[in-house]
């Protein structure tokens, strides 16, 4: 959402996804934010600054340095402002992550094993890379998918669907109950299973 605010206000991409220093990127966001009044991002940002950092001002280009310094100081010294602390203070009960079918879900396993974590973190199955045969890297991805299910290669459509089914089952064991799809287009052509 922050990137959208920045892009819609003409901020050069090098300050959004580029390699400019974090402080400069924050400055550009702060300068763009006042143009988002009425957009939830404007209100969320200022509400978060108030609730978590005790800042009663409004973030803009003129206050960016003050906010940057305040937030960085509090993040370094306030034990309530750890990732877990922020999640717990926000009364978050469930976090869904977006995960690729070949992911090992290592951190999901670690979180599940930690009895001190009181909220649920579950993976979501996002098989985009297994869908579009025209995307660069598709063949390499299929080789990785084959390897993760213990196969040398996936030589037929049934092999691919079986591999994806195995990964869905693994994800389900790890708490997955949702999938997430980012399709560039929806290919459709009537075909029989044999075709």
Regions found by a protein language model. Name each.
Residues 1-195:
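Metal-cofactor-binding active-site regions of metalloenzymes
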